[in-house]
Amino acid sequence: MTTAAAAWFAVVFFLLPGFLVAWVAGLRVPAAVTTALPVTFGVIGVSSWMWGVTSAPFNLWTFGVSMVLALAVAGGWRYAFARKARRGGDVPWHRALFPGKVEWTHWGIPFVGVAVAAWMAVTDRLSWLAQMPNGADNIVQGWDSQWHANAVRFVMETGVASSTRMGELQNFETHARLFYPSGFHAGVALFAEAAGLEPIRAVNIASTVLPAVALPLTMV
């Protein structure tokens, strides 16, 4: 997969799960899009912890199970509010499940701005990476980048992504307990597995795409 294709794939991969959960829970499409990224990582964070207390590895299959559970909870949440809205029988089910309407004219320009800003940020960073030795496979020579790449590789190789079990990586000799927020690393590990990327390349692409998409979305 080329770097550009992987970047486009990352946009869909990180936005789609959160969008589906937010929309099923009752948000309208524009609001579901704007909240998609934090919802995705919320599901990933809870999922990685949940599977960390079992013997099952955290990977695309177990995350898929978590998505089914999240969608079921979101659907139950929406149904409960729709049922409450229908008390008395005056409101039809469709109206109760999909109240109001979306004024697309109010959302069009902001979303165009988000798309343009994200595209500019991603293309600038990817162009910079392309000029480096080994391109997107080049790791920045700093503690943070190396730690993040190591954490992603650890998740991919062991299936351990729980934030309460990061001592198994950082305290390699003793495995002393350590809490470290690992939602980013769990998400990037899933992305790398789905796209067939090595950890360093996945970290570089995800570190480019995620802030480029998240920052303009916060301004909508």
Regions found by a protein language model. Give the residues of each.
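Membrane-embedded, hydrophobic transmembrane alpha-helices
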Residues: M1-W107
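Lipid-exposed faces of alpha-helical membrane segments in multi-pass integral membrane proteins
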Residues: V39, V43, S47, V65, ...
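Active-site lumenal/periplasmic loops and adjacent helix-entry segments of GT-C-fold
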Residues: I109, A117-V220
